[in-house]
Amino acid sequence: MILELDCGNSFIKWRITTKSDAAVVSVGVVDSDAALLEHLRNLSDTTFSDCRLVSVRSAEETARLVSVLTNAFSVTPVCAVPARELGGVVNGYDDFERLGLDRWLAFVGAYHLVKRACLVIDLGTAVTSDFVDAGGAHLGGFICPGMPLMRNQLRTHTRRIRYDDTEAERALVRLVPGRATAEAVERGCSLMLRGFALTQVEIARGYWGDDFAIFVTGGDAALVADVLPGARIVPDLVFVGLALACPLR
């Protein structure tokens, strides 16, 4: 079995897969190293002999997690590192080491799945988009605040905007003009993300006409799925790229 980790800014996504055919055996999302250890220790009928991870945390935080995993489970995690080229995709950043590793692995994974031009939109704490042409050249992309950042900025800097997560969830049932603060904020932010997504599609069409694939990933992918007909929703896209970056024997 293989333990795979995607260590983001806010959460750690983990899954355990079989080594033979990459079938997913167990999966979860936690908000701390301690919670990760607790979940993994409670998997009484599942063990793993290998581990690979991608992290956008600081080097010190990543090293600490690697040490914890090594001591707790006697595995040596293999960490993804920046690369100029991977899986037939050429990194388009002027300084390739500055491109976020999770973002890089997501569009490398997307290209690996289709081997054609693709647009990859990742909706997490931040929202990113990336464009890869049919030959594997990364043309660049965009970054904007995701739903959590927009929501928290309004709550932090506007005194009268206060509501809980339950209200936020109810507000997104439909996207008519809000008649309460939670509705107005949640629907407004959602519409901004949908507009962002549609703009990315128009940019992609300017490059390739209709000859490209659209991938959507990240925790808030559902917010834009209905305005992107034909898009492939792939929650574990980063893990597809991670397998290419960190192959295990």
Curated annotation (Swiss-Prot):
Name the cofactor(s): NH4(+); K(+)
Please name the pathway: Cofactor biosynthesis; coenzyme A biosynthesis; CoA from (R)-pantothenate: step 1/5
Catalytic residues (UniProt):
102
Q: What Gene Ontology cellular component terms go with this record?
A: cytoplasm
Q: Which residues bind substrate?
A: 93, 100-103, 181
Name the chemical reaction catalysed here. (R)-pantothenate + ATP = (R)-4'-phosphopantothenate + ADP + H(+)
For this protein, what is any one GO molecular function term?
metal ion binding
Q: Where in the cell is it found?
A: Cytoplasm
Q: Top EC class per UniProt?
A: transferase
| Entry EC no(s) | 2.7.1.33
Q: Which residues bind K(+)?
A: 122
Q: Which family does it belong to?
A: Belongs to the type III pantothenate kinase family.
Q: What job does this protein perform?
A: Catalyzes the phosphorylation of pantothenate (Pan), the first step in CoA biosynthesis.
Its subunit composition reads: Homodimer.
Under which name does UniProt file this protein?
Type III pantothenate kinase
The gene coding this protein? coaX
